[in-house]
């Protein structure tokens, strides 16, 4: 058994699609739009075959909180410490908030954590 995909609500579907394509080499399918339900989504497929569905419905405006129950972050493995550093530096230079890192965690992971445009936490690790 494997996870088929995970999904996240977003406010700006096109901006978030561009984010995952530009920084994480994702490839989006064609836009799905259900007019009756005011719902739109893209499935973004990454090099590993993992898929993320980004979804918009009406006005989802509640900002994420780091202290709520539910999903905490999504993590991307980039293959090396150097690539963690490079991608973190690129995201920081482009104006994204670096929440922490790059650093080695107490349990031995090398990672950084950034916020996307909508405040979702993205972990970048080896």
UniProtKB/Swiss-Prot annotation:
Domain VOC: 2-126
Coiled-coil ranges from the UniProt annotation: none
UniProt xrefs under InterPro entries: Fosfomycin_Res_Enzymes (IPR051332), Glyas_Bleomycin-R_OHBP_Dase (IPR029068), Glyas_Fos-R_dOase_dom (IPR004360), VOC (IPR037523)
SUPFAM superfamilies xrefs: Glyoxalase/Bleomycin resistance protein/Dihydroxybiphenyl dioxygenase (SSF54593)
Superkingdom assignment: Bacteria
Protein name: Uncharacterized protein YyaH
Organism of provenance: Bacillus subtilis (strain 168)
